[in-house]
From Swiss-Prot:
Pfam families: Methyltransf_7. It comes from Arabidopsis thaliana. Optimum pH is 7.0-8.0. It catalyses: benzoate + S-adenosyl-L-methionine = methyl benzoate + S-adenosyl-L-homocysteine; salicylate + S-adenosyl-L-methionine = methyl salicylate + S-adenosyl-L-homocysteine. Expressed in flowers and at lower levels in leaves and stems. Hardly detected in roots and siliques. Expressed in the sepals and the leaf trichomes and hydathodes. Signal peptide: none annotated. Salicylate binds at residues 47, 176-177. Disruption phenotype: Loss of accumulation of methyl salicylate upon pathogen infection, no accumulation of salicylic acid or its glucoside in uninoculated leaves and no development of systemic acquired resistance. Increased attractivity to parasitoids. This is Salicylate/benzoate carboxyl methyltransferase.
Length: 379
């Protein structure tokens, strides 16, 4: 391809012009592809559990969307941050099933449904699309219906769809990923993310980047979704309101930071390399989420819920199993970025260290995670 043409392609992230080589690893942000032992597809039990938790909100908003739009004959649904594997279809299945059951109940014909699966271009769409025939077969058995499935590669911090074309948007455990690493983290060296030892400036930098990104997300989706269309969004969140720096010793990025420090001590990773790595991630609390939505102004909040649940480690047979399962889950969501920055040769050792650190903290066996679920209506 002519490089002159490549240089004219619009940016996939709205602020890519500010993403320099210092944080080049952010461009590798995607889940581990394929269906092997270390893949996202094989290590996404938590994400499946979260989808099940949010199901009542999704069903309720799908029904209300259909009734408020007077049962349209065509529906376009988008799954943003779909990743790879079977989980990509769980929410879509619930949406289609809800629509068909409701239409039967009120004696209406079911609409034709387009389902758009979105993630960054680096995502393993091939593994996901292999499940499309099985998905449509299950729909036919359950609902005597099918849908049309499309891929929509690109950043959800950019425009993805034509104006007023979407009726329902769903996203689960994707919007806590930021478009870039925040600026002004020089005083947070040795930490991948916010910890209790971080300066207040690190928290403010992360919060500002989240506010900027989520505002942009809402603004872009408001152009793409029809009036009275719905969004159901689920985030990794936190409960703490008074201490914005609080992340306990079992927070997944704290454990990963400690594991990388072990490799620095052993001479496998340079300290400067560790200092140059920061996660493009933010876990908001309810108030922070609400403030961005209200300030941006395009959507009404229908529901905003906080759910805490354990990760299931307490029921695992031994500490080693708990440590290995959590290490595999974090590896599945961070490995491509870690390889891009640190190299592939340290990855197995790094997550052996991670699993060990989980076993050293009794609290990790009883660890809980917080999920925020918000449903929105386009004004």
């Amino acid at each position: 391809m002519d490089p002159r043409f490549i240089n004219t392609i619009p940016s996939l992230r709205y602020d890519d012009d500010k993403c320099d080589d210092e944080y080049a690893f952010v461009k590798a942000l995607c889940m581990s592809g394929g269906d092997g032992a270390n893949s996202y597809s094989a290590n996404s039990r938590l994400q499946k559990k979260v989808l099940s938790m949010a199901k009542p909100v999704l069903v309720r908003n799908t029904e209300e969307m259909m009734m408020n739009l007077d049962f349209p004959t065509y529906i376009k649904v988008a799954e943003l941050g779909c990743s790879s594997g079977q989980n990509s279809f769980l929410a879509i299945f619930e949406i289609i099933n809800t629509i068909n059951v409701l239409c039967q109940h009120v004696n209406k014909n079911s609409p034709e449904i387009d389902c758009c699966l979105n993630d960054l271009p680096e995502n393993d769409f091939n593994t996901t699309f292999k499940f499309v025939p099985f998905f449509n077969k299950e729909l036919m058995i359950t609902n005597k219906s099918s849908c049309f499935v499309y891929g929509a590669p690109g950043s959800f911090y950019s425009r993805l769809f034509s104006r007023n074309s979407l009726h329902l948007i769903h996203s689960s455990y994707a919007l806590h990923w930021l478009s870039k690493v925040p600026e002004k983290l020089e005083n947070n060296k040795g930490n991948l993310y916010i910890t209790s030892s971080s300066p207040q400036s690190a928290y403010k930098a992360y919060l500002n980047q989240f506010q900027k990104d989520f505002t942009m997300f809402l603004r872009l989706r408001s152009e793409e979704i029809v009036s009275n269309g719905r969004m159901v969004l689920t985030f990794i969140g936190r409960n703490t309101l008074n201490d914005p720096l609080y992340r306990d010793c079992c927070h997944f990025w704290t454990l990963l930071s400690n594991s990388l420090r072990d490799l620095v001590f052993e001479g496998l990773v340079s300290e400067s390399k560790l200092d140059a790595f920061n996660m493009p991630f933010y876990d908001p609390n309810v108030q922070e989420l609400k403030e961005v939505i209200q300030k941006e102004g395009s959507f009404e909040i229908n529901e905003l819920e906080s759910h805490g649940f354990d990760l299931g480690h307490y029921y695992e047979e031994d500490d080693f199993e708990a440590g290995r399962n959590e290490a595999n889950g974090i590896r599945a969501v961070s490995e491509p970025m870690l390889i891009a920055h640190f190299g592939e040769e340290i990855i197995d050792t790094l997550f052996d260290k991670y699993a060990y650190h989980v076993t050293q903290h009794a609290n990790c066996r009883n660890k809980t995670t917080v999920s925020l679920v918000v449903s929105l209506t386009k004004k």
